[in-house]
Amino acid sequence: MKMPEDPVILLSFVNTQLRDKGIKPGELAKEYGVEYAKLEAKLKGIGYCYDPAVNQYK
């Protein structure tokens, strides 16, 4: 399975995966074979940043 391309759908997908799997974004990126920096940039592009206190993008 690939990560969604649309940034808003990607946000929902990533937050769901982080919650369900209990992993960090870098681990998720590695699992899906994507560069963490690109994932981070795509989500920052729509105004979301990772909050490690709750393990999600807000």
Predicted regions and their residues:
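N-terminal acidic leader/helix
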Residues: 1-24
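Short, acidic, Ser/Thr-enriched surface-loop or helix-capping motifs
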Residues: 52
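Short alpha-helical "recognition helix" segments of helix-turn-helix
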Residues: 28-29
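Short acidic, Pro/Gly- and aromatic-enriched capping/linker segments at domain boundaries
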Residues: 35-49
